Regions:
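PRPP-associated nucleotide enzymes
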Residues: 1-182
């Protein structure tokens, strides 16, 4: 799966206030949806045991994947939209009757620093929903340990990819004078 995302090594601005040493072309993952079908099933099996009412996915990320998992599970799909002017803020559109009490899983294509899933979880909690899990095609770097510890929900990655990410202001590659890869 990682091969499909055409990985590149270097010094990258991840666009979330973080820098990292790995870039993945995540849009390339969705070029041939049938290749993801086994992974969608695997993610769905993990989330089914949480009896979710909905699956949420960040539109600038795993929304296509989240939609496929929601369809497989026969539950609602919630799109997380990036908030204008905020690097890491997301908002959900209004849902008739609200989502208070809904058990919701967040699904993303890849989790690195966790900013998108953290923002979606925060928005869900703010709306009264009960986040129960995060799932992703790929866990990058320390995300497999960080998500449960920092975000308080189980994390189900279909694969793990070695990489490193740092807050931009503490990036060792910047400190060493390594130019950002374009």
């Amino acid at each position: 799966m990682v091969r499909l995302a055409r990985p590149r090594s270097g010094h990258f601005d991840l666009g979330t206030g973080y820098h990292g040493d790995l870039w993945l072309d995540l849009d390339a993952l969705f070029l041939r949806p049938s290749r993801l079908r086994p992974h969608v099933r695997w993610l769905g099996e993990r989330l089914r045991e949480h009896e979710v009412d909905a699956v949420c996915g960040p539109v600038e990320g795993g929304a296509f994947l989240a939609y496929a998992v929601a369809d497989l599970l026969g539950v609602a799909f919630l799109a997380g939209y990036r908030s204008p002017g905020e690097a890491t803020g997301y908002h959900l559109p209004a849902v008739h009757g609200g989502i208070g009490g809904w058990r919701v899983a967040v699904v993303d294509d890849a989790v690195n620093a966790g900013t998108a899933v953290a923002a979606c979880l925060g928005e869900l909690r703010g709306r009264g929903a009960v986040p129960v899990a995060v799932a992703a095609l790929m866990s990058l770097g320390q995300a497999s340990a960080m998500v449960p510890a920092r975000l308080g929900v189980p994390f189900y990655p279909a694969s793990t990819v070695p990489s490193r990410a740092w807050p931009a202001e503490r990036c060792p590659l910047c400190a060493d004078g390594t130019p950002v890869t374009t």
